Amino acid sequence: MAVRLCDVASLLRSGSWAAEPWTGQVIAAMETQLSNGPTCNNTANCPNTINNCSSPVESSNTEDSKTNLIVNYLPQNMTQEELKSLFGSIGEIESCKLVRDKITGQSLGYGFVNYIDPKDAEKAINTLNGLRLQTKTIKVSYARPSSASIRDANLYVSGLPKTMTQKELEQLFSQYGRIITSRILVDQVTGVSRGVGFIRFDKRIEAEEAIKGLNGQKPPGATEPITVKFANNPSQKVNHTILSQLYQSPNRRYPGPLAQQAQRFSRFSPMTIDGMTSLAGINFPGHAGTGWCIFVYNLAPDADESILWQMFGPFGAVTNVKVIRDFNTNKCKGFGFVTMTNYDEAAMAIASLNGYRLGDRVLQVSFKTSKTHKA
């Protein structure tokens, strides 16, 4: 059933594909595969194909899922047209979509390809799954139809050793079920791991088992227990019970000016759930379309914007900060807002700073809930 790799390589050499910066790497990968032979143990089932033998494709029972594929780990600069052309070399495509960030427009590294013929979808999996493009090894599998059993299967993991690789992260979690995607967040400047990652399982029950088995445990190379929890989705109603249990660590204390300012804060004034909900309707300029808006509560009266920049800046790109002040006294009213461009970075900041002790105050940090700000 597999399409010959030499045919795909020849197709890539022709037309506009020849000029693409990563086309040569694709062809080289295919020719290496052809010269070295199949890499999987069962050579009879995968002649001249690139396959991820450690993650066998699982077929679904519905006809739609037999033609609809999900493609993970795509190069950041790959366009939707290039994705369509690559998979169109296998067979006729009904639709193709590269998933992009709703705010920045940047590729999220995965997409969907829907074929006319189920046989072409199967050929695409056998031919292109495991293909290396630039620094990425793409993963091609059947897209799963939506159901309650697969929703909310995305986990947020913090406290990871900075030396842990994405492969090691998957090895740690793979014992609990089939992993769909994984990611470790790195500093955009240094490229060093931030010790935070995401794991998406095939089913929610697998994610639940991973939480039971790994939350609070020390993986190899770790000096402190890791925290494993369901990733917070800003499109859902905020679960304040879960937020109150988010990751805290004595190592997450900020030195320098932030520590000096923290010494000035002396009063702790806890906030009720109803209080947080009632403030969610405040109109913070730019929150609807410029990024993910974060609500920060329990700031001291003399808190200013600089402390929010210093707190949230290490987690990613911050586009705006605002401390809400009393009109008469010009003192902080106890809360403020931070806007970050990237959801993963915003989620990491929330997980790290919710419950963070700033002087004698314990901060409450969550996504700002608003009818006008939807995921």
Curated annotation (Swiss-Prot):
Gene3D superfamilies: 3.30.70.330. Keywords: Cytoplasm, Developmental protein, Repeat, Ribonucleoprotein, RNA-binding. Residues 67-145, 153-233, 292-370 form the RRM domain. Its main location: cytoplasm. InterPro entries: ELAD_HU_SF (IPR006548), HuB_RRM2 (IPR034999), HuB_RRM3 (IPR034914), Hud_Sxl_RNA (IPR002343), Nucleotide-bd_a/b_plait_sf (IPR012677), RBD_domain_sf (IPR035979), RRM_dom (IPR000504). GO terms for molecular function: RNA binding. GO terms for cellular component: cell cortex; ribonucleoprotein complex. PROSITE patterns: RRM (PS50102). The keyword Repeat applies. It holds the Pfam family RRM_1. It comes from the Eukaryota. It is found in: Cytoplasm; Cytoplasm, Cell cortex. Binds to poly-U elements and AU-rich elements (AREs) in the 3'-UTR of target mRNAs. Required for the vegetal localization of vg1 mRNA. Probably required for nervous system development. Part of a ribonucleoprotein (RNP) complex, at least composed of elavl1/elrA and/or elavl2/elrB, igf2bp3/vg1RBP, ddx6/Xp54, ybx2/frgy2, lsm14b/rap55b and, in a subset of RNP complexes, stau1/staufen. Binds RNA as a homooligomer. PANTHER family: EUKARYOTIC TRANSLATION INITIATION FACTOR 3 SUBUNIT G. Belongs to the RRM elav family. This is ELAV-like protein 2.
